[in-house]
Amino acid sequence: MATFVLVHGAFQGGWVWGRVDEALTELGHRVHRPTLGGCGLHRARPEAALGLGQYAQELVQYLKDEGLINVTLVGHSYAGLVCSLAAAALPEAVVRLVLVDGVLPKPGLCFADIAGEPFGKMLAAHALPGGLVRPWPLESFGVSPEAAAWFQERLGPFPLAAFTEPCPQDFQFSEAKRAFISCIPAKTPLLRLMANRAESEGWDVHALMSGHCAMVSAPLELSGLLH
């Protein structure tokens, strides 16, 4: 039995991992799916000041409060940054780090830096008053038409600072086992770049035929890879 902590990407909440939670639980694992501040049930009132550092610390505190050890920490998309920082901050608790179409941090760079100019333009186009960002177009998430309405009604704004706060200059990955699950075909240059980088840095890389949000479009297949 393993202990999984599943962390959602931008605009979402712990709800997005529901079917993966069910599948892993049936396989005998313990599953946690926390919701980052200002997301999920609290999406109507996100805090604009929340950034990468605060989200990482929030996740570290969650692991401590729950008394979790021997954790497999799974981050999707944006949460690749959050989970990587949390794993580095709490190496005694996190033994395995898995990124699902996740963004790998680089010291001194923020999400927007890593994603490049096209993302910067999209970020500006989706900016809301008060330092928030509205969700990307639905097709960016790669969910099926059957799940589209259910998925979209649960999305909410996300703090701009989360995309613009840089990773600490002294960041280094922990010694935890690392795996990257690439949802193919990758829809953006960023996701292809992340998969290639993970492979070049010696991560265990797995391909999954799925849309970007594999926990919605291919939950059983994703659960099988995590298991």
Predicted features by range, described:
Residues C183-V216, E221:
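Conserved loop-alpha-helix segment in the C-terminal half of the alpha/beta-hydrolase fold
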Residues E153-Q172, A186:
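Active-site nucleophile elbow and catalytic-triad environment of alpha/beta-hydrolase enzymes
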Residues R30-H32, L36-T72, A88, A112-E117:
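Active-site loop/oxyanion-hole signature of alpha/beta-hydrolase fold enzymes
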